[in-house]
Amino acid sequence: RWTVKTSAYTAVAGDRLLADTATTAAFTITLPSAPAVGDEIHILDSAANFDSANLTVARNGKKIQGLTADLTLTTENTGIGLVFMSDTYGWRVLVDAYAVDTTEL
């Protein structure tokens, strides 16, 4: 089941989020602080607005793609999945059929 989010939110394992930055402008989705291996979070740009109102995915102390930086989604219609692998690698990004600006990874 997918849930619409229009403001800051802390995700939980299994979330499927329709992020609408057109309603209230750019905001942040924070990943869980104590994920288990295999936990997944899915995020879609429900309003095709990430290019003008970015969505930040805050790492909450864990890495994303092995990096110690938050992820900023800046391409409209972007959809990603994140799977937690380990403390070493952190969250791995699964990209859907839409483009993702990988310069932000």
Each model region followed by its residue ranges:
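Surface-exposed loop/edge segments in extracytoplasmic proteins
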Residues: 64-66
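Beta-strand-rich interaction surfaces with strong enrichment in secreted/lumenal proteins
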Residues: 68-73
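Exposed extracellular interaction/assembly regions and N-terminal maturation sites
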Residues: 1-58, 89, 94-96
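Short, low-complexity N-terminal tether/leader segments at secretion or assembly junctions of large
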Residues: 51, 58-62, 75-105
